[in-house]
Amino acid sequence: MDKVELSDLSFNKDWSFYLLAHREFVPTATDKYACRVSHITLKEPKVVTWERDM
């Protein structure tokens, strides 16, 4: 996906970390959105579908 912005890598006191990725978009009534996360600790990528009421 193009035009994705990433935050700096941020660490918590326990050394866990997070990274925010975002992109501007204009949703329509029929669009469906999902986020896919790949990580070495996951056996397969995790896909989360975003609900309309979020």
UniProtKB/Swiss-Prot annotation:
One cellular component term from this protein's GO annotations in UniProt: extracellular region
Gene3D superfamilies: Immunoglobulins (2.60.40.10)
Boundaries of every Ig-like C1-type domain copy: 3-41
Coiled coil spans: none
Entry annotated with the keyword Secreted: yes
Subunit structure: Heterodimer of an alpha chain and a beta chain. Beta-2-microglobulin is the beta-chain of major histocompatibility complex class I molecules.
Function: Component of the class I major histocompatibility complex (MHC). Involved in the presentation of peptide antigens to the immune system.
Name used for this protein in its record: Beta-2-microglobulin
The organism of origin for this protein: Mesocricetus auratus
Gene: B2M
